[in-house]
């Protein structure tokens, strides 16, 4: 194998996706292998998810305008999946590559310019190429299909913005409708208004901020995930850490558990409506890498947008130290548009785990094949 082959664009074991395309290329997309036949599917099922991540929808996102309209190229017939690979494409329509012409000669602080050059000896400098946030279009398109399958299995996934800079959502007044109806994707209208006002000042100050996203996976049956190297929480963490700007992931109570006694942190088991349940959920719905039947709680911490309109020090490829002023169209905060990406990566992970789990028990296999 040649050293400069770009691996790492494929995710999943059975429900397997490969994303492709660059920020300023002709198009981006995804190929999905392993989707079961018979799922009712059209572009509108996918488009509603892509609309949540597309740019240019508010004053706190990049002014780049893209329709991000998806087209299904293969894998469906008469409105249903055929079980063969599904290919989805979204064409770029608003590239302004001249904004990035100077970037070919230097490395932007906080971006992957230097590391891509170090690895491949060559890079697409226009908007970051494969390291751009637009790469997530393929993930969201595939995740939309995963979410539709999961709904039929009784599993729902809801991600939202927990905080933006110092502004936090009040979880005691959680309002699911607010997630889709605010520019911040916060479940709290009041906090969202405060966050927008804060972000406007950040934008005027030519700076950027980070934030925290949270995801709740409801309806997961107990017993999903594998021990040791294929733990469900480990795979969720990997999936969400693969989102470009995410720098930390927590499951359940996360970092807080390091300050507790075992007597405080253990979730007591109980019987609820005749079923095994827990009185608390500090574990975040996963024990030993396997789902315990409770809601799975995941948080992701996102760094500030690295492209800021201030003079910054860096080096060029001579190399020598220089000062730069970045041009282009950039978000003062990434989090609101990344929320749906987190939701879709969680969906891809748990659906794949549930499909893998079909082979875990002989009685389940016997029951299935005897019925069929």
Which role fits each region the language model picked out?
Residues 118-228:
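Glycine-rich, mobile lid/loop segments that gate access to catalytic sites or pores
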Residues 104-129, 312-330:
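Short acidic, glycine/tyrosine-flanked loop/strand segments centered on an H-E-D-like triad
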Residues 50-109, 113:
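Glycine-rich, N-terminal phosphate-binding loop and its surrounding beta-alpha-beta segment
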Residues 16, 307-372:
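Internal helix-turn-beta structural module
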Residues 20, 26, 206-321:
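Glycine-rich anion/phosphate-binding loop at the beta-strand->alpha-helix junction
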Residues 26-38, 134-155, 230, 234-238, ...:
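Alpha-helical support elements that line or immediately flank enzyme active sites
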Residues 5-64:
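N-terminal, positively charged regions that mediate nucleic acid binding
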Residues 16-19, 124-135, 222-226, 283-286, ...:
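A short glycine/serine-rich beta->alpha loop
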């Amino acid at each position: 194998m040649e050293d400069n082959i770009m691996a790492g664009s494929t995710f999943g074991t059975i429900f397997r996706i490969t994303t492709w395309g660059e920020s300023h290329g002709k198009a981006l997309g995804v190929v999905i292998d392993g989707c079961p036949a018979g799922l009712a599917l059209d572009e509108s099922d996918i488009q509603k998810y892509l609309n949540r991540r597309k740019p240019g929808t508010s004053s706190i996102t990049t002014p780049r305008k893209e329709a991000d309209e998806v087209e299904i190229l293969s894998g469906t017939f008469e409105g249903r999946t055929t079980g063969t690979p599904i290919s989805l494409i979204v064409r770029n329509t608003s590239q302004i590559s001249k904004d990035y012409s100077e970037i070919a000669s230097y490395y932007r602080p906080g971006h992957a310019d230097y590391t891509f050059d170090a690895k491949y000896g060559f890079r697409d400098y226009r908007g970051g190429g494969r390291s751009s946030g637009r790469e997530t279009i393929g993930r969201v398109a595939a995740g939309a299909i995963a979410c539709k399958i999961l709904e039929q299995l009784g599993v729902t996934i809801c991600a939202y913005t927990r905080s933006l800079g110092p502004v936090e959502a009040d979880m005691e007044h959680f309002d699911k409708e607010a997630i889709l109806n605010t520019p911040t994707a916060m479940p709290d209208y009041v906090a969202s208004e405060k966050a927008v006002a804060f972000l406007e000042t950040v934008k005027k100050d030519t700076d950027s901020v980070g934030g925290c996203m949270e995801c709740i996976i409801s309806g997961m049956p107990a017993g999903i995930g594998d021990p040791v190297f294929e733990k469900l929480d480990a795979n969720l963490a990997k999936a969400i850490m693969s989102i470009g700007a995410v720098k930390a992931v927590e499951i359940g109570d996360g970092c807080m558990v390091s300050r507790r006694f075992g007597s405080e942190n253990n979730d007591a088991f109980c019987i609820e409506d005749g079923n095994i349940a827990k009185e608390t959920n500090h574990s975040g719905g996963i024990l030993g890498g396997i789902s315990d039947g409770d809601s799975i709680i995941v948080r992701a911490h996102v760094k500030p947008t690295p492209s800021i309109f201030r003079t910054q020090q860096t080096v060029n490829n001579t190399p020598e130290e220089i000062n730069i002023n970045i041009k282009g169209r950039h978000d003062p905060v990434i989090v609101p548009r990344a929320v749906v990406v987190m939701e879709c990566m969680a969906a891809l992970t748990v659906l794949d785990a549930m499909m893998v789990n079909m082979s875990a028990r002989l009685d389940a296999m016997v029951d299935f094949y005897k019925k069929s």
